[in-house]
Regions:
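Conserved active-site loop region of the serine DD-peptidase/beta-lactamase
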Residues: 80
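Flexible, low-complexity segments enriched for small/polar residues
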Residues: 40, 44, 48-75, 83-229
């Protein structure tokens, strides 16, 4: 028990939460309340829905939520069991292109594709591979982890990321690094498009028909199929 409990700030007396009255010692009441909330069926459903929305689909099927919720209840919330249930739900119920990539994951996917180090400044000419520059890019992309909105954190919904402003930020970032970073790495957007979309497909031809190297990179990395998983 690593909980610190301040008796000075505690409101004395009995406390009733969700129809149950807690009469124990103040610090024990807190632990008892937390355990009851964790065991409540509504808690497992809430957690299961949020996990399914993050990994399966913005509007996940009821079966996916129930699979995760059942694992939570059966194991008492054991993380390893719940995580395995999430994987099973993804395998069984997710479809290709169901989830839109948040900026952070999209950024990592871009640099994984070009096999390049992370990353250049979002604005500027100097190479700098330390943490602050990565934070600068994530901030410009609108997804700096330490600035997540409260109380719900970053949204898992595509509608919150698919806005003109947020798309413009991604376009500008690809436009910047394509001029030097991608060329230096020997990255070929047309070959990558053939591998990702299928040689001869409409999407691959769309990338191949780009008038410039920069434009080809933008068409590839800002293509709907690249930005979804």
């Amino acid at each position: 028990n690593n909980t610190y409990f301040s008796h000075k700030g505690n409101e004395p007396g009995h406390h009733t939460v969700m129809g149950k009255t807690y009469k124990q010692d103040p610090s024990k009441k807190l632990l008892s309340l937390c355990k009851d909330l964790a065991r409540d069926p509504k808690t497992s459903l809430h957690i299961a829905k949020r996990l399914a929305q993050h990994f399966v689909a913005d509007d996940p099927p009821r079966e996916a939520i129930e699979l995760i919720s059942h694992a939570y209840n059966r194991s008492g919330g054991t993380l390893a069991v719940v995580h395995q249930a999430v994987i099973d739900a993804v395998v069984k119920f997710s479809r290709e292109d169901d989830k839109f990539l948040q900026p952070e994951i999209w950024l990592f996917q871009v640099h994984k594709a070009i096999q390049g180090e992370l990353p250049l400044k979002f604005v500027g000419d100097t190479d700098d591979h330390n943490g602050p520059q990565l934070n600068s890019i994530l901030s410009e992309l609108g997804h700096l982890n330490c600035r997540s909105p409260q109380p719900n954190g970053w949204s898992d919904m595509a509608i919150d990321w698919l806005t003109p402003e947020m798309m413009d930020r991604r376009l500008r970032y690809i436009g910047q690094i394509s001029n030097r970073k991608m060329r230096e790495s020997g990255f070929d957007p047309k070959k990558y498009a053939d591998m990702l979309f299928g040689a001869g497909s409409n999407s691959a031809q769309f990338v191949a028909s780009a008038p410039t190297y920069r434009n080809a990179c933008i068409r590839l990395f800002c293509h709907p199929k690249f930005m979804r998983t």
